[in-house]
């Protein structure tokens, strides 16, 4: 089993911030297939048992590979971390180089 933390892209504000109170958690039982649409905000799957979990993620070819161009440090480019990968982080996560645009509680699955 695992939990997916999901949000809607249209809830991202014009300044690229996102209110974490809009996140919904979904329990995905083992053996279940899930499609996450391109307009879905999501975080890495979360384990619900100390033994962890295994999952398969299928992405378009080239996704998460190194950028082949110089991005600008403004607008949506601030969120781009790799090909087809945008990241809005929480300040508490202290992810080097990430755009800290998650506002509100830093959600944890306990």
Residue spans of the language-model regions?
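Aromatic-residue-lined binding/catalytic grooves and analogous aromatic/hydrophobic interfacial grooves
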Residues: 36
């Amino acid at each position: 089993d695992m939990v997916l933390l999901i949000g809607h892209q249209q809830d991202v504000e014009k300044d690229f911030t996102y209110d974490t109170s809009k996140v919904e958690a979904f329990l995905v039982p083992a053996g279940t297939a899930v499609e996450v649409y391109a307009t879905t905000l999501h975080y890495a799957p979360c384990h619900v048992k100390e033994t962890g979990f295994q999952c398969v993620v299928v992405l378009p070819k080239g996704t998460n590979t190194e950028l082949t161009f110089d991005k600008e440090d403004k607008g949506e480019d601030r969120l781009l971390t790799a090909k087809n990968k945008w990241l809005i982080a929480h300040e508490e996560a202290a992810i080097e180089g990430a755009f800290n645009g998650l506002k509100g509680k830093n959600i944890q699955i306990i």
